[in-house]
Amino acid sequence: MVYEAKIDPSLADLFRNSDKEPFPAMTHELPPEKSLKARLLEQEDERISNVLAHEKRFSTEPVVIDDVFMSRLCVDSQPGCSRIPDIDIANVFRDDLESCTLSSSEDEEEEEEPIGQISTFEMLHAPRKPIVWSEQELSDFDMKSRLLDMRMDHWDLARIANVPKRIAKGETVNLRMPRYSAEVVKQRIAKGVTDIFGHFSLVPHTLTKSHKPVAERKQILIERYHDLMNDFDYATRPGSVESKKYANLTKRLNLCNDFLSAPKLPHRLFPRLIIRSIRPPETPKEPVKRKMRESESDDSVIIIPRKIEKEKPRPTTENVVLKKVEMEKKRPRSPELVPKKIVMEKERPSSPDSEAEEREHNLRIEKERHQKELEFRREALRKREQEREEHKKRAQEELRRQMTAALEESTRRQAEMNRQIEDEARKRDELQRIAEEKKRKQLLEDQCRAKQEKEKRDAEELEQMRLNIARLAGTKDVENALKSPSLVEIVPPSDARAFEMIKWNAVKCKIPENWEKRKDKFYRVFEWPSDAAQRDIERDEVVSIPRSKPIVIPQEDTYITRNRIPLKLPPKVKQAVPALVVRNSNNATRTVVAATVNENGIQWPAETINIDEVVREIRGLMAPTRRNFAISLSPKTDEIDYQAINLNRLKSGIVYPFYFSDGLYWPLVFLKSSKNGKPEAQRHVEALTSCKSFSGKYASRYLLTTTKEEDSATKKFEDAYADSDGDWADYSTKPGRFSNRAGFKPHYDTSNDSFEVQKQRAVDSLNSQYEKERNELDAFGRYTDEYRKRKDRAQYQNHIKTHLRELVRDARLDAFSFKEEFKDFEGGFEDYPGTRVEPYENDWYSHGYTLYSHTRDAAYADYMHDVCKPYEDMLPPTEYHEIFNEWCFTPMLASLHYQLKKNAFDVLSPQDVKDMEARHRKYIGLVQKERKFSLEQALDVCKLTDYDKRQWTILHDQLVTHFKDFPSISGLVYDRNTNLLANVNRNLKHLFSTIYRDDSPPDDQF
């Protein structure tokens, strides 16, 4: 019986309508698939090129006469030359002699050949002569073959199994190509011949049919595509066999219930035997045997008499022949119905008394049968009632148990709720107590401060009284004190506005006495690089920071996670402000920096910062979610589980959108030229290569090998890295690029080592990889220095482009972008690697950037900050960051459409797949070139849904690769002289203020 799989109607509709779904628009056409004719033409061109190469090779060399290959021209041109076996010229392209035609006859008809020089190409089209071997050569060959067989048998060597087939195939090869004149070619064109010049004459010989039987070829094909067939065989999928068993059990249960509800037993409880026999006449012993059988007990024997019929003529044979035995289907055995021994009564002479006895006996049997049937029904009814009572009793016990469990659960919940209320009350009392304690301490501090101020004023009054007494007394010391100047002469600056700003008192501060101890304690708490020289340099840099700039103190040990967040962005170079030159009586001068005035007219002292901004920034950096987020995403401690991270928690720890992604590409705006005349791409690569800790391949290894199974994960990474090379049109169509990734499926620890040992092994491996990448970058730096010294700018530019291509190739792993191309300026635009050409508007690319880097990469971070700072002004106001982040967080959701065609059923349900198809259709219609882009529709399409969160790992990988290769506004030529930034900023503010209007004040993000 062949089992027919039952397919879900929703899946069947999905596969039925899959061919009708429109494909996304492609800017570059895929290379067309080559037809059979095109492939054969390529084979023919390759063969002709080999012939020409061979002709060129042997045209100038002298001809060497040997017994393997010999030109016919040499044989005919030398009179008296002995007959040497000829060989087909086609064999010069083969290494074996399997295509040779062996013949022992020497009476071969020789064709007349033209005398003169014949080119190799003409000889190729000329008719060939078969090879003729003499009897001596054949005997020698046979003897050597036998000797070879003996040696192979001695050393147990295997022979070539298909030598006869190869020889038979080689004999059918015909390398002669017909040569047609112009008239013949015209006639063939008029007839519609496909092969006009006869280039396909070798097709029947090159494409031969396999000699294997059909069954063997089918078996090979099935084994080759076994995995693919299992994916689409719904009968062998998990759950199908269990479903079939469950259906059979359900069917049997229904039949049993129907039988118990209305049993219908047949009239006969025993098998019916219809026996027709042909017996000989009774012998003298037969009556005695019959009496013995009749004398047996009725409990063990039931005599079934034959029907009395007309006596038929009996043959005289002595053997009894059974003609036909029919038996009905046996009923299920039961203890009430046990068939007794059945003995067939032999035929007796019919008489009226025997007929009456037989009818009475039949009635008695029929009555007993009816009585047993009634007893059986009563017993079945009694059992049914008993089972019903037991089932009712079990249901009542189950209901009672559930009610008891529900009561216990409600009691437990009530107790838990009461406990929470008590905890909240206790916490509230604790907070109130802390507030009162704080208020009391503040009151004591105010009292102490007031007391100190009062004592200070009293001391000043006493000092003033002492001076007055001394002055009135007219002492000499007081006169000298009065003669000394008491005021400071102020020299006004050239700017008249400076006099209005002198309202600040200069307070001299000194370093605390325990500064050295505090500094040493700070360096001991945090883990610094093992390089002692580098550590000393960094310490000196920290100490030598000007007092006008804040000291960067990390809030936690972030060196292990390679995430170092600066407390403050590098300040801009401030313009020179007018200074006040103060002179005293001793001709000592000191410079006092004047205050500045901001846009609102409020005066602030120079070289100062807003305290509220610093406090808000410190609170954001010290928030619990931000502080713990780097630990949860550390790629060195354990495997990253993105599905376990809450979306709100992820957003709170991410400025936009991947704050802790190692090896991140900043969304750089490439300028046409800079102040020093270098292209921005060159400056970017120079700054990137000077960054000692950056590497595309090193960062990609974090994303692809986040598992404890080092061997398999490394192999998968190397395979993915090798597959990323080549034509993008071929690479983008590969199925299942995310379902079998190393970091996106649960991996179980198969090692018996402890976690510390495995962690140390992973750290050592990563350190070795880092050292290797650093050595490569150091070598690159040496090469660039040599190019600079030689001033070979062309070679230096080529080297820069090569390095940039490698970096882009590292970031192209599982990325959705086109093949990189390097071009010059065309119409004012410069094409860079990874540039997209979809018809988005400029507003679509508007998103922020993030700064995080290692301590030694501060130069590269400063460079990226200077380039991206003007573009950051295009962002919307702070109160709309949450909406703007969600909008920028989801532009690649709709690009997961290829998962629908490949392997989406491993992650999503059929309903989710339908929803994704609908969203994909909206997305394709949104980015069509003939339609204008609408930001409102884009916001509606790119909203996060529940099924997006269920495929969080795939989504995170898409977004990582998306923002690696997706420049911010690559199609926009950035020009500082235009008013483009102001216009875009104004439009964005108006857009977000109209769509997301909210009169309530924004919530505090921290």
Swiss-Prot record:
GO aspect biological process, one term: negative regulation of DNA-templated transcription
Domain of life from the UniProt record: Eukaryota
InterPro entries with a match to the protein in the record: Znf318-like
Record's keyword terms, sorted: Coiled coil
Coiled-coil positions: 358-473, 756-782
Region feature Disordered, mapped onto this chain: 326-371
Keyword Acetylation: no
Compositional bias per record (Basic and acidic residues), positions renumbered to this chain: 338-350, 358-371
Gene Ontology CC, one term: nucleoplasm
Protein name: Uncharacterized protein D1044.6
The species this protein was found in: Caenorhabditis elegans
